[in-house]
Amino acid sequence: MVIQRKYRASRRLGVSLWGRSKDPFNTRNYPPGQHGNMGYKKPSDFGKQFGAHKKFKFYYAISSKQMRNMFLKAYKKKGDTGDNFVGLLESMLSSVLYNSGLVPTIFSARQLISHKHVLVNGKVVNISSYSVKPGDTIKLREKAVNLPPVLAAIDAQEQKVPDYLEVDVKERSVKYLRVPKYYEVPYPANMEVNLVIEFYSR
């Protein structure tokens, strides 16, 4: 299964990235591969930085190039670089939709967006990295509200909806209230943004 392959990231990094019950890491908490059951090696300082970078990359399902561009943008902004960086990541359309709990995974969020099933303030947006602004309302289109993944996500209620989102399950919509700080994001895994900053500052 495609989703199972994507969840391999959790086993490679040694942590349940998305905190989902179907995550193979919950039952096989060792690296994938022939010699995986030998366990995880203690990483070097660079290894820790690279691992932290990978966690964010996989968690948000973005490319290394997108990650770097977002970091550079965050670095140039006034304020705390870590907060700026996480704020940019959490403001992506795919992140807002996933965090709403209306979809089961970040991957399904990106798929619904690319298939033009998502509206932002009443208009179709099919770019997952689209930057949502405070006050924007994201809604699933009529033909998507009863799709199996959507119904399953709502029924499972595995996603902890953060305080900076206002979700209307009945309307299949979510309002983005404000850009969060790093400490406000309810990551299911230990996400060390300070190590990401160190990684890009080498």
Swiss-Prot record:
GO biological process, one term: translation
Domain S4 RNA-binding intervals: 91-168
GO MF annotations in UniProt: rRNA binding; structural constituent of ribosome
Family matches, as Gene3D superfamilies: Ribosomal Protein S4 Delta 41, Chain A, domain 1, RNA-binding S4 domain
Keywords linked to the UniProt accession: Ribonucleoprotein, Ribosomal protein, RNA-binding, rRNA-binding
N-terminal signal peptide: none
HAMAP family, per the entry: Ribosomal_uS4_B (MF_01306_B)
Protein name (record): Small ribosomal subunit protein uS4
Organism: Ehrlichia ruminantium (strain Welgevonden)
Organism phylogeny: Bacteria, Pseudomonadati, Pseudomonadota, Alphaproteobacteria, Rickettsiales
Gene assigned in the entry: rpsD
